[in-house]
């Protein structure tokens, strides 16, 4: 140290990154934010956020295990849910505010069609789908017991998402990160 000053700019927004070896579970890269020393908070392992559409493949995987195929047709059309007890109406939409009608599951997944994901979850049942998705290593208590689960409204850490996704990359086997 020469007694000089050092400057650093603390970013206003922070992020996290997790990279796992899907075959072994080895953590290849982990970034939990700008500075753990400043915040004592690791966003990669502690920050629970909604994964959004990156969660849909888990719902589709459950559908494939429940008799659907990549070629199965599912209706991408408007749907309305009425909660009589709360006197609320839910009209889910696709991000484009368009509907494509009957669409093959493979196309619906790569186009991230919300209504198809919701219909798949509805047809399989929320509780049985949660039981299936928990096999990827997710805590059932973090998975909402309603149809919004199909849109990725669970609260999960980046580590949990990366761990779940690793099963897709290694033939369906769950790993434990280390």
Specify the residue positions occupied by each region the protein language model found.
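Extracytoplasmic/secreted proteins, especially bacterial periplasmic and envelope-associated proteins
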Residues: 50, 58, 62, 69, ...
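Active-site-proximal helix/loop microenvironment
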Residues: 135-178
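Beta-lactamase-like hydrolase cores
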Residues: 2-21, 106-109, 121-122
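A short, polar/charged loop-to-alpha-helix boundary motif
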Residues: 37-47
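Structural recognition of the beta-strand scaffold that forms the well-ordered cores
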Residues: 18-19, 28-30, 72-75, 107, ...
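Active-site SXXK
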Residues: 24-25, 48-76, 108, 164-168
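Conserved catalytic neighborhood of penicillin-recognizing serine enzymes
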Residues: 23, 68-129, 170, 174
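A short, well-structured edge-of-sheet supersecondary motif
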Residues: 9-37, 136, 178
């Amino acid at each position: 140290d020469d007694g000089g000053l050092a400057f650093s700019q603390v970013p206003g927004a922070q992020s996290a990154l997790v990279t796992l070896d899907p075959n072994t579970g080895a953590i290849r890269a982990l970034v939990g934010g700008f500075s753990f020393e400043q915040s004592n908070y690791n966003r990669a392992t502690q920050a629970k956020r909604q994964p959004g559409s990156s969660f849909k493949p888990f719902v589709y995987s459950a559908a494939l295990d429940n008799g659907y195929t990549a070629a199965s047709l599912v209706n991408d059309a408007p749907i309305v849910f009425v909660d009589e007890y709360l006197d609320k109406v839910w009209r889910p939409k696709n991000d484009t505010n368009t509907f494509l009608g009957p669409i093959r599951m493979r196309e619906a997944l790569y186009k991230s069609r919300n209504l198809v994901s919701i219909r798949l979850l509805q047809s399989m049942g929320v509780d049985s789908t949660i039981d299936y998705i928990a096999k990827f290593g997710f805590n059932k208590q973090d998975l909402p017991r309603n149809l919004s689960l199909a849109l990725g409204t669970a609260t999960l850490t980046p580590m949990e998402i990366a761990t779940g996704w690793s099963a897709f990359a290694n033939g369906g086997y769950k790993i434990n990160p280390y």
